[in-house]
Amino acid sequence: MSTLDAAFGALADPTRRAMIQRLRSGEATISALATPHEMTLSGAFKHVRVLQDAGLVRSEKRGRTVWCWLDPKPLRKVADWVSHYEAFWNSQLDSLSAHLSNSRGKEG
């Protein structure tokens, strides 16, 4: 599986997207990532593992606590892919808008 495929797969889950959102503000413990979702630590760790496998999150055990933080490189690949298609669709919508404007002008 490519890095991009793994990233999209990991981001397909709303809980993992919320964890990514939380990690935007800085590193967090597994416990802090689990709390808003009322899930067990093992459940949160499974989500973090998917994010790690996709390269989106890194972690480190400090004492008895596991800390997590974002790795921006795979997110940049996702953003680049999305922006490519955003430009394409914006162009298509602009063409459609011009076509509709011309069609209305011919009817009147």
Residues of each region from the PLM?
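C-terminal regulatory/oligomerization modules of transcriptional regulators
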Residues: 1-3, 22-41, 50-58, 73-108
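Short alpha-helical elements of helix-turn-helix
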Residues: 11-17, 21
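Conserved catalytic core of two-component histidine kinases
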Residues: 70
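Short amphipathic alpha-helical boundary/capping segments
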Residues: 4-11
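Short, Lys/Arg-rich nucleic-acid/phosphate-binding segment
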Residues: 61-67
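Well-ordered beta-strand positions
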Residues: 12, 58-60
